[in-house]
Amino acid sequence: MKLLTGLVFCSLVLGVSSRSFFSFLGEAFDGARDMWRAYSDMREANYIGSDKYFHARGNYDAAKRGPGGAWAAEVITDARENIQRFFGHGAEDSLADQAANEWGRSGKDPNHFRPAGLPEKY
């Protein structure tokens, strides 16, 4: 529902043309897919201390798609952090995750968070 509300808001309030609206949708979809790929890789790697790297990488890849990708990355990461906070995960870890998310979304190199020994596949 938030996705639909956000898209309608962008369309009506910001005066987005139909062509750029569909471009935004495509970027958002591809950005969400980038986030899912980073999450899947994190689960597959199962490497201690690598979560910040995968957070930054997913946000970086999504933001490279354009404004729609960056928007999708922000919505997904905020939702994930809010859910984790609700279930009692530490606030300190959540702040570190959000810093890694913002690092990636701002276009900075996600390898800054890459732990030593993480296989090159990732």
Curated annotation (Swiss-Prot):
Keywords: Acute phase, Amyloid, Amyloidosis, HDL, Heparin-binding, Methylation, Secreted, Signal. Induction: Upon cytokine stimulation. GO terms for biological process: acute-phase response; lymphocyte chemotaxis; macrophage chemotaxis; negative regulation of inflammatory response; neutrophil chemotaxis; platelet activation; positive regulation of cell adhesion; positive regulation of cytokine production. Changing G90D: In allele SAA1.2. Residues 98-122 are annotated as: Disordered. Belongs to the SAA family. This is Serum amyloid A-1 protein.
